[in-house]
């Protein structure tokens, strides 16, 4: 069995790390590079950086900080935000990123997934999916342009259909951002994760809802995800990554040292 991954997520806006609740009301957390360095030193397995307004602003990720991050950390990192072309991706890889993640641009042009996977290999291409649970209908929908509250919209894709589609097109990994849980810290949506796990044959990363160490354990043990992504519990030092890994090891979860 592959070891499970602990992945801090850094949402970036205007050169700063920010964090919201359910993708809204973002507060500034701090500077990108010192936070990245701290997480690497604490034992994070990789980092994910989302330039959250790039797609909604119609631009690509601000690359000025990508190179600076690559200089100070020695763990893999993934960059997302408005990547719409092979050239966009080439630049980000050239600055030192190990993976790229696409979300809204993939919804706008699903062929982009295949083009990027063919050019850089599936292992380097992550598809981020922002899901929203509609309580009235019991359906899970895929949302687009979630970095900007005023532009966020529900697509016509139901979650499981889109998960299947992106795999067929060459996604090497899926990060499921469960919007209802985001920043609330009451646990990952295990029901949703289990449904996605059934149809997801590539590595699946859970995102949205971590508040306590047991939430990570539940995602790994009950939903069998490959990685757990979290932001606010790490940013606010509610959970220390080293202590989290020690707890998971004690719980019998195989974790990277």
UniProtKB/Swiss-Prot annotation:
The active site is at 11, 130. It catalyses: 5-[(5-phospho-1-deoxy-D-ribulos-1-ylimino)methylamino]-1-(5-phospho-beta-D-ribosyl)imidazole-4-carboxamide + L-glutamine = D-erythro-1-(imidazol-4-yl)glycerol 3-phosphate + 5-amino-1-(5-phospho-beta-D-ribosyl)imidazole-4-carboxamide + L-glutamate + H(+). Pathway: Amino-acid biosynthesis; L-histidine biosynthesis; L-histidine from 5-phospho-alpha-D-ribose 1-diphosphate: step 5/9. One of its GO terms (molecular function) is imidazoleglycerol-phosphate synthase activity. Pfam families: His_biosynth. This is Imidazole glycerol phosphate synthase subunit HisF. The lineage of its organism: Bacteria, Pseudomonadati, Pseudomonadota, Gammaproteobacteria, Pasteurellales. InterPro entries: Aldolase_TIM, His_biosynth, HisF, IGPS_HisA/HisF, RibuloseP-bd_barrel. It is found in: Cytoplasm. It is an enzyme of class 4 (lyase). Heterodimer of HisH and HisF. Keywords: Amino-acid biosynthesis, Cytoplasm, Histidine biosynthesis, Lyase. The gene is hisF. CDD domains: HisF. It comes from the Bacteria. Its main location: cytoplasm. Gene3D superfamilies: Aldolase class I. IGPS catalyzes the conversion of PRFAR and glutamine to IGP, AICAR and glutamate. The HisF subunit catalyzes the cyclization activity that produces IGP and AICAR from PRFAR using the ammonia provided by the HisH subunit. It comes from Actinobacillus succinogenes (strain ATCC 55618 / DSM 22257 / CCUG 43843 / 130Z). Belongs to the HisA/HisF family. Its EC number is 4.3.2.10. GO terms for cellular component: cytoplasm. GO terms for biological process: L-histidine biosynthetic process.
């Amino acid at each position: 069995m592959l070891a499970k991954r602990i992945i801090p997520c850094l949402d970036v806006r205007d050169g700063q790390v920010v964090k919201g609740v359910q993708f809204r009301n973002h507060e500034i957390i701090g500077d990108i590079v010192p936070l990245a360095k701290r997480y690497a030193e604490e034992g994070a397995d990789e980092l994910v950086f989302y330039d959250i307004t790039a797609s909604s602003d119609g631009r690509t990720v601000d690359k000025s900080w990508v190179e600076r991050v690559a200089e100070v950390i020695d763990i893999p990192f993934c960059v997302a935000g408005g990547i719409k072309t092979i050239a966009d991706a080439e630049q980000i890889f050239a600055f030192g990123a190990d993976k790229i993640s696409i979300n809204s641009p993939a919804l706008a042009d699903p062929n982009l997934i295949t083009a990027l996977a063919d050019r850089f290999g599936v292992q380097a291409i992550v598809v981020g999916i922002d899901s929203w649970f509609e309580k009235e209908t019991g359906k899970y929908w895929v949302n687009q342009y979630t970095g900007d509250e005023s532009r966020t919209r529900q697509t016509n894709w139901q979650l499981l259909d889109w998960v299947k589609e992106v795999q067929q097109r060459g996604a090497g990994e899926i990060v499921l951002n469960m919007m209802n849980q985001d920043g609330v810290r009451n646990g990952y949506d295990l029901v949703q994760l289990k449904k996605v796990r059934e149809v997801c044959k590539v590595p699946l990363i859970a995102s949205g809802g971590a508040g306590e160490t047991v939430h990570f354990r539940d995602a790994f043990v009950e939903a069998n995800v490959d990685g757990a992504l979290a932001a606010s519990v790490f940013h606010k030092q509610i959970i220390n990554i080293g202590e989290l890994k020690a707890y998971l090891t004690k719980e019998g979860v195989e974790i990277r040292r």
